[in-house]
Amino acid sequence: MASQASLKLQPSNQSQQAPPNITSCEGAPEAWDLLCRVLPGFVITVCFFGLLGNLLVLSFFLLPWRRWWQQRRQRLTIAEIYLANLAASDLVFVLGLPFWAENVGNRFNWPFGSDLCRVVSGVIKANLFISIFLVVAISQDRYRLLVYPMTSWGNRRRRQAQVTCLLIWVAGGLLSTPTFLLRSVKVVPDLNISACILLFPHEAWHFVRMVELNVLGFLLPLAAILYFNFHILASLRGQKEASRTRCGGPKDSKTMGLILTLVASFLVCWAPYHFFAFLDFLVQVRVIQDCFWKELTDLGLQLANFFAFVNSCLNPLIYVFAGRLFKTRVLGTL
Protein backbone atom coordinates (compact mmCIF):
# COMPACT_ATOMS: atom_id res chain seq x y z
CA MET A 1 0.00 0.00 0.00
CA ALA A 2 2.67 2.48 0.93
CA SER A 3 4.59 1.82 -2.23
CA GLN A 4 1.95 3.64 -4.23
CA ALA A 5 3.64 6.74 -2.90
CA SER A 6 6.43 5.97 -5.32
CA LEU A 7 3.85 5.81 -8.08
CA LYS A 8 2.53 9.28 -7.26
CA LEU A 9 -0.99 8.39 -8.24
CA GLN A 10 -2.44 11.86 -7.73
CA PRO A 11 -5.77 12.08 -9.50
CA SER A 12 -5.62 15.65 -10.66
CA ASN A 13 -2.42 17.24 -11.77
CA GLN A 14 0.74 15.30 -11.01
CA SER A 15 2.90 13.38 -13.42
CA GLN A 16 3.75 9.84 -12.47
CA GLN A 17 6.04 7.14 -13.72
CA ALA A 18 6.27 3.84 -11.88
CA PRO A 19 9.87 3.01 -11.00
CA PRO A 20 11.20 -0.50 -11.61
CA ASN A 21 11.90 -1.10 -7.92
CA ILE A 22 9.01 -0.18 -5.66
CA THR A 23 10.05 0.51 -2.09
CA SER A 24 8.55 2.17 0.95
CA CYS A 25 9.81 3.76 4.12
CA GLU A 26 9.26 2.53 7.65
CA GLY A 27 5.93 3.75 8.95
CA ALA A 28 4.61 4.73 5.52
CA PRO A 29 1.99 1.93 5.23
CA GLU A 30 0.20 3.16 8.35
CA ALA A 31 0.21 6.75 7.06
CA TRP A 32 -1.26 5.72 3.71
CA ASP A 33 -3.88 3.51 5.34
CA LEU A 34 -5.00 6.41 7.52
CA LEU A 35 -5.12 8.77 4.55
CA CYS A 36 -7.20 6.35 2.46
CA ARG A 37 -9.69 5.93 5.30
CA VAL A 38 -10.07 9.56 6.35
CA LEU A 39 -9.48 11.74 3.30
CA PRO A 40 -12.42 10.59 1.10
CA GLY A 41 -14.96 11.76 3.69
CA PHE A 42 -13.43 15.22 3.83
CA VAL A 43 -13.34 15.39 0.03
CA ILE A 44 -17.04 14.54 -0.24
CA THR A 45 -17.80 17.24 2.34
CA VAL A 46 -15.88 19.78 0.27
CA CYS A 47 -17.75 18.59 -2.82
CA PHE A 48 -21.14 19.06 -1.14
CA PHE A 49 -20.50 22.59 0.10
CA GLY A 50 -18.72 23.52 -3.13
CA LEU A 51 -21.70 22.39 -5.20
CA LEU A 52 -24.16 24.18 -2.91
CA GLY A 53 -22.24 27.45 -2.77
CA ASN A 54 -21.42 27.70 -6.45
CA LEU A 55 -24.92 26.71 -7.56
CA LEU A 56 -26.36 29.43 -5.32
CA VAL A 57 -23.97 31.99 -6.80
CA LEU A 58 -24.85 31.01 -10.36
CA SER A 59 -28.57 31.00 -9.60
CA PHE A 60 -28.36 34.51 -8.19
CA PHE A 61 -26.50 35.82 -11.23
CA LEU A 62 -28.21 33.94 -14.03
CA LEU A 63 -31.70 32.69 -13.19
CA PRO A 64 -34.82 34.73 -14.14
CA TRP A 65 -35.75 35.59 -10.52
CA ARG A 66 -32.69 37.82 -10.45
CA ARG A 67 -34.72 40.33 -12.47
CA TRP A 68 -37.27 40.53 -9.66
CA TRP A 69 -34.50 40.87 -7.09
CA GLN A 70 -32.77 43.69 -8.94
CA GLN A 71 -35.25 45.26 -11.33
CA ARG A 72 -33.22 48.31 -12.24
CA ARG A 73 -30.32 46.37 -13.75
CA GLN A 74 -30.76 43.11 -15.62
CA ARG A 75 -27.35 42.83 -17.24
CA LEU A 76 -24.42 41.44 -15.33
CA THR A 77 -21.91 43.96 -14.09
CA ILE A 78 -18.19 43.56 -14.74
CA ALA A 79 -17.62 42.04 -11.31
CA GLU A 80 -20.59 39.70 -11.74
CA ILE A 81 -19.25 38.46 -15.08
CA TYR A 82 -16.01 37.43 -13.41
CA LEU A 83 -17.76 36.00 -10.35
CA ALA A 84 -20.21 33.98 -12.45
CA ASN A 85 -17.34 32.51 -14.45
CA LEU A 86 -15.44 31.75 -11.24
CA ALA A 87 -18.49 29.99 -9.81
CA ALA A 88 -18.92 28.01 -13.03
CA SER A 89 -15.26 27.02 -12.99
CA ASP A 90 -15.39 25.98 -9.34
CA LEU A 91 -18.62 24.07 -9.98
CA VAL A 92 -17.00 22.03 -12.75
CA PHE A 93 -13.95 21.62 -10.52
CA VAL A 94 -15.88 20.10 -7.60
CA LEU A 95 -17.84 17.77 -9.90
CA GLY A 96 -14.62 15.81 -10.30
CA LEU A 97 -14.08 15.40 -6.56
CA PRO A 98 -16.28 12.29 -6.05
CA PHE A 99 -14.09 10.44 -8.56
CA TRP A 100 -10.98 11.52 -6.67
CA ALA A 101 -12.52 10.49 -3.33
CA GLU A 102 -13.43 7.07 -4.70
CA ASN A 103 -9.95 6.68 -6.16
CA VAL A 104 -8.29 7.41 -2.81
CA GLY A 105 -10.79 5.31 -0.85
CA ASN A 106 -10.20 2.45 -3.30
CA ARG A 107 -6.47 2.68 -2.54
CA PHE A 108 -5.75 4.27 -5.92
CA ASN A 109 -7.30 1.45 -7.93
CA TRP A 110 -9.13 3.47 -10.61
CA PRO A 111 -12.51 1.81 -11.31
CA PHE A 112 -13.94 4.15 -13.97
CA GLY A 113 -12.00 3.26 -17.14
CA SER A 114 -9.49 5.11 -19.32
CA ASP A 115 -11.93 7.61 -20.83
CA LEU A 116 -13.08 8.97 -17.47
CA CYS A 117 -9.47 8.89 -16.28
CA ARG A 118 -8.53 11.36 -19.03
CA VAL A 119 -11.70 13.45 -18.85
CA VAL A 120 -11.86 13.85 -15.07
CA SER A 121 -8.14 14.56 -14.73
CA GLY A 122 -8.15 16.97 -17.67
CA VAL A 123 -11.21 18.89 -16.49
CA ILE A 124 -9.79 19.25 -12.97
CA LYS A 125 -6.45 20.40 -14.39
CA ALA A 126 -8.11 22.91 -16.74
CA ASN A 127 -10.24 24.41 -14.01
CA LEU A 128 -7.26 24.66 -11.68
CA PHE A 129 -5.78 27.19 -14.10
CA ILE A 130 -9.12 28.82 -14.95
CA SER A 131 -9.96 29.43 -11.30
CA ILE A 132 -6.57 30.96 -10.51
CA PHE A 133 -6.57 33.16 -13.63
CA LEU A 134 -10.07 34.39 -12.79
CA VAL A 135 -8.92 35.34 -9.29
CA VAL A 136 -6.22 37.44 -10.96
CA ALA A 137 -8.83 39.04 -13.24
CA ILE A 138 -11.04 39.86 -10.25
CA SER A 139 -8.10 41.45 -8.44
CA GLN A 140 -7.25 43.48 -11.55
CA ASP A 141 -10.87 44.61 -11.90
CA ARG A 142 -11.02 45.82 -8.30
CA TYR A 143 -7.67 47.51 -8.73
CA ARG A 144 -9.08 49.54 -11.62
CA LEU A 145 -12.32 50.26 -9.76
CA LEU A 146 -10.65 51.62 -6.65
CA VAL A 147 -7.46 53.14 -8.03
CA TYR A 148 -8.96 54.54 -11.27
CA PRO A 149 -12.73 54.72 -10.55
CA MET A 150 -13.59 57.47 -13.04
CA THR A 151 -12.27 55.52 -16.05
CA SER A 152 -13.56 52.07 -15.12
CA TRP A 153 -17.19 52.07 -16.24
CA GLY A 154 -19.10 51.41 -19.44
CA ASN A 155 -20.03 48.81 -22.03
CA ARG A 156 -16.52 48.69 -23.42
CA ARG A 157 -15.21 47.22 -20.17
CA ARG A 158 -18.10 44.76 -20.05
CA ARG A 159 -17.12 43.42 -23.46
CA GLN A 160 -13.50 43.31 -22.35
CA ALA A 161 -14.49 41.25 -19.32
CA GLN A 162 -16.40 38.80 -21.50
CA VAL A 163 -13.45 38.44 -23.88
CA THR A 164 -11.06 38.07 -20.93
CA CYS A 165 -13.16 35.25 -19.48
CA LEU A 166 -13.30 33.51 -22.86
CA LEU A 167 -9.52 33.72 -23.21
CA ILE A 168 -9.07 32.37 -19.69
CA TRP A 169 -11.22 29.33 -20.45
CA VAL A 170 -9.30 28.73 -23.68
CA ALA A 171 -5.98 29.06 -21.84
CA GLY A 172 -7.11 26.57 -19.20
CA GLY A 173 -8.07 24.11 -21.92
CA LEU A 174 -4.75 24.48 -23.71
CA LEU A 175 -2.70 24.11 -20.53
CA SER A 176 -4.57 20.91 -19.68
CA THR A 177 -4.03 19.35 -23.12
CA PRO A 178 -1.09 17.15 -21.99
CA THR A 179 -3.28 15.74 -19.23
CA PHE A 180 -6.08 14.91 -21.68
CA LEU A 181 -3.62 13.24 -24.06
CA LEU A 182 -1.24 11.42 -21.71
CA ARG A 183 -3.45 10.24 -18.86
CA SER A 184 -4.38 6.56 -19.00
CA VAL A 185 -5.13 3.57 -16.81
CA LYS A 186 -2.10 1.34 -16.30
CA VAL A 187 -1.87 -1.96 -14.48
CA VAL A 188 0.60 -1.94 -11.58
CA PRO A 189 1.24 -5.63 -10.80
CA ASP A 190 3.30 -4.92 -7.67
CA LEU A 191 0.30 -3.26 -6.05
CA ASN A 192 -2.39 -5.30 -7.81
CA ILE A 193 -4.17 -2.14 -8.99
CA SER A 194 -5.06 -0.35 -12.22
CA ALA A 195 -4.00 3.24 -11.67
CA CYS A 196 -4.99 6.45 -13.47
CA ILE A 197 -1.55 7.91 -14.11
CA LEU A 198 0.18 10.45 -16.32
CA LEU A 199 3.18 9.00 -18.15
CA PHE A 200 5.42 11.48 -19.93
CA PRO A 201 7.21 10.26 -23.08
CA HIS A 202 10.44 12.11 -22.21
CA GLU A 203 12.24 13.37 -19.11
CA ALA A 204 12.10 16.95 -20.43
CA TRP A 205 8.33 16.93 -19.87
CA HIS A 206 8.92 17.06 -16.12
CA PHE A 207 10.59 20.45 -16.46
CA VAL A 208 7.82 21.68 -18.77
CA ARG A 209 5.21 20.57 -16.25
CA MET A 210 7.03 22.32 -13.42
CA VAL A 211 7.12 25.61 -15.36
CA GLU A 212 3.48 25.24 -16.36
CA LEU A 213 2.22 24.32 -12.90
CA ASN A 214 4.45 26.28 -10.52
CA VAL A 215 5.30 29.34 -12.62
CA LEU A 216 2.25 29.89 -14.86
CA GLY A 217 -0.18 28.40 -12.35
CA PHE A 218 1.08 30.00 -9.14
CA LEU A 219 4.09 32.33 -9.05
CA LEU A 220 2.98 34.70 -11.82
CA PRO A 221 -0.67 34.82 -10.64
CA LEU A 222 0.52 35.34 -7.07
CA ALA A 223 2.76 38.22 -8.15
CA ALA A 224 -0.18 39.83 -9.99
CA ILE A 225 -2.54 39.36 -7.03
CA LEU A 226 -0.03 40.88 -4.62
CA TYR A 227 0.64 43.80 -6.98
CA PHE A 228 -3.02 44.68 -7.49
CA ASN A 229 -4.00 44.30 -3.85
CA PHE A 230 -0.98 46.24 -2.60
CA HIS A 231 -2.00 49.19 -4.75
CA ILE A 232 -5.64 48.83 -3.65
CA LEU A 233 -4.55 49.01 -0.02
CA ALA A 234 -2.35 52.02 -0.77
CA SER A 235 -5.27 53.75 -2.50
CA LEU A 236 -7.64 53.03 0.38
CA ARG A 237 -5.09 54.30 2.86
CA GLY A 238 -4.82 57.55 0.92
CA GLN A 239 -8.59 57.90 0.68
CA LYS A 240 -8.91 57.29 4.41
CA GLU A 241 -6.54 60.12 5.19
CA ALA A 242 -8.44 62.43 2.83
CA SER A 243 -11.93 61.59 4.05
CA ARG A 244 -11.79 61.22 7.82
CA THR A 245 -14.61 63.71 8.20
CA ARG A 246 -16.91 61.53 6.04
CA CYS A 247 -16.82 58.60 8.50
CA GLY A 248 -15.11 56.37 6.00
CA GLY A 249 -12.80 54.74 8.48
CA PRO A 250 -14.85 51.67 9.44
CA LYS A 251 -15.74 50.92 5.84
CA ASP A 252 -12.11 51.28 4.78
CA SER A 253 -10.97 49.02 7.60
CA LYS A 254 -13.52 46.39 6.60
CA THR A 255 -12.38 46.56 2.98
CA MET A 256 -8.72 46.30 3.94
CA GLY A 257 -9.46 43.31 6.13
CA LEU A 258 -11.31 41.66 3.27
CA ILE A 259 -8.40 42.19 0.89
CA LEU A 260 -6.03 40.57 3.36
CA THR A 261 -8.50 37.68 3.70
CA LEU A 262 -8.54 37.18 -0.07
CA VAL A 263 -4.76 37.06 -0.31
CA ALA A 264 -4.44 34.83 2.77
CA SER A 265 -7.06 32.43 1.40
CA PHE A 266 -5.19 32.15 -1.89
CA LEU A 267 -1.87 31.49 -0.14
CA VAL A 268 -3.21 29.01 2.44
CA CYS A 269 -5.11 27.00 -0.17
CA TRP A 270 -2.56 26.96 -2.99
CA ALA A 271 0.95 27.45 -1.55
CA PRO A 272 1.19 23.96 0.05
CA TYR A 273 0.06 22.31 -3.17
CA HIS A 274 2.64 24.07 -5.31
CA PHE A 275 5.38 23.52 -2.71
CA PHE A 276 4.86 19.76 -2.80
CA ALA A 277 4.41 19.84 -6.58
CA PHE A 278 7.88 21.38 -6.84
CA LEU A 279 9.28 18.73 -4.49
CA ASP A 280 7.66 16.15 -6.78
CA PHE A 281 9.56 17.67 -9.71
CA LEU A 282 12.81 17.32 -7.76
CA VAL A 283 11.97 13.67 -7.08
CA GLN A 284 11.21 13.03 -10.74
CA VAL A 285 14.53 14.49 -11.92
CA ARG A 286 16.31 12.55 -9.12
CA VAL A 287 17.54 15.57 -7.22
CA ILE A 288 15.72 14.10 -4.21
CA GLN A 289 16.36 10.37 -3.75
CA ASP A 290 15.99 9.92 -0.01
CA CYS A 291 13.14 7.57 0.86
CA PHE A 292 11.78 9.79 3.62
CA TRP A 293 11.46 12.84 1.35
CA LYS A 294 9.83 10.79 -1.39
CA GLU A 295 7.19 9.51 1.00
CA LEU A 296 6.71 12.96 2.51
CA THR A 297 6.25 14.45 -0.96
CA ASP A 298 3.66 11.85 -1.97
CA LEU A 299 1.65 12.15 1.24
CA GLY A 300 1.98 15.92 1.20
CA LEU A 301 0.65 16.12 -2.34
CA GLN A 302 -2.50 14.25 -1.39
CA LEU A 303 -3.17 16.51 1.59
CA ALA A 304 -2.21 19.66 -0.34
CA ASN A 305 -4.63 18.66 -3.10
CA PHE A 306 -7.36 18.70 -0.47
CA PHE A 307 -6.48 22.21 0.72
CA ALA A 308 -6.49 23.42 -2.90
CA PHE A 309 -9.95 21.94 -3.39
CA VAL A 310 -11.22 23.71 -0.26
CA ASN A 311 -10.64 26.95 -2.16
CA SER A 312 -13.60 26.05 -4.37
CA CYS A 313 -15.84 26.20 -1.27
CA LEU A 314 -14.38 29.46 -0.02
CA ASN A 315 -14.57 31.32 -3.34
CA PRO A 316 -18.38 31.74 -3.43
CA LEU A 317 -18.47 33.10 0.11
CA ILE A 318 -15.41 35.34 -0.09
CA TYR A 319 -15.65 36.73 -3.60
CA VAL A 320 -19.40 37.36 -3.75
CA PHE A 321 -19.25 39.17 -0.41
CA ALA A 322 -16.14 40.97 -1.64
CA GLY A 323 -17.93 42.02 -4.83
CA ARG A 324 -20.81 43.62 -2.93
CA LEU A 325 -18.50 45.37 -0.46
CA PHE A 326 -16.17 46.61 -3.18
CA LYS A 327 -19.08 47.93 -5.22
CA THR A 328 -20.36 49.87 -2.19
CA ARG A 329 -16.88 51.20 -1.51
CA VAL A 330 -16.33 52.34 -5.12
CA LEU A 331 -19.70 54.08 -5.34
CA GLY A 332 -18.75 55.96 -2.21
CA THR A 333 -15.65 57.38 -3.91
CA LEU A 334 -17.46 58.74 -6.98
From Swiss-Prot:
Induction: By lipopolysaccharide (LPS) in heart, liver and lung five hours after treatment. Keywords: Cell membrane, Disulfide bond, G-protein coupled receptor, Glycoprotein, Membrane, Receptor, Transducer, Transmembrane, Transmembrane helix. Residues 63-80, 140-161, 236-258, 324-334 are cytoplasmic. It comes from the Eukaryota. This is a receptor for bradykinin. Could be a factor in chronic pain and inflammation. This is B1 bradykinin receptor. It is found in: Cell membrane. Residues 1-41, 102-118, 183-214, 280-302 are extracellular. Disulfide bonds join 117-196. The lineage of its organism: Eukaryota, Metazoa, Chordata, Craniata, Vertebrata. One of its GO terms (biological process) is cell migration. It holds the Pfam family 7tm_1. Residues 10-21 have a biased composition (Low complexity). The gene is Bdkrb1. GO terms for cellular component: plasma membrane. It comes from Mus musculus.
